[in-house]
Amino acid sequence: LTHLFANNMTSRNGGHILNVASLAAWTPIPNQNVYAATKAYVLSFTQALHDELKASKSGVTVTALCPGYTATKMMDNPAQGGKLLVPSSMLQSPREVAEQGIEACLAGRSTIVTGLANRITVAITRLFSKMALAKIAGRYYRSNMH
């Protein structure tokens, strides 16, 4: 589907595609393995396509939007009567995520990780063992799922 839109935009000499990945693409979390894997695919696919289209001078840019925790229904924990999976102070509003995604599109960026705390998380993930971070995140999720 992305290639179909990219071909159409290329014929018009410009356009932008925004694919939604996630912070989970950078920091895989136990108990969310399929989600993290699909988001990692979206991130990798988007970055590769961004470079392909940039090299071809198509005028089309592709951006991966990687939001962290966002105040949506996905953050509700039905096992605990709808209690949030994370503290509300960690949540971004959908509007904040959308605005940062649009800014990244306009700047022609291949990737945007929304929110300062999330960008710091990605930087730490790149510096330290993913295994250690996954264990910490896994403990947090397991303690909040029961």
PLM regions and their residue ranges:
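Active-site helix of classical SDR
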Residues: T2, T38
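Residue(s) in the substrate-gating loop at a strand-loop-helix junction
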Residues: S22
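Short-chain dehydrogenase/reductase
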Residues: T111-T125, G138-R139
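SDR active-site lid
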Residues: E52-A117, M131-A134
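Active-site loop immediately N-terminal to the catalytic Tyr-X3-Lys motif
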Residues: I29-N33
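Active-site-adjacent segment of SDR/Rossmann-fold oxidoreductases
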Residues: N8-M9, T27, A48-V60
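A short helix-coil junction within the Rossmann-fold of NAD(P)-dependent oxidoreductases
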Residues: L4-N13
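Rossmann-fold scaffold of SDR-type NAD(P)-dependent oxidoreductases
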Residues: N19
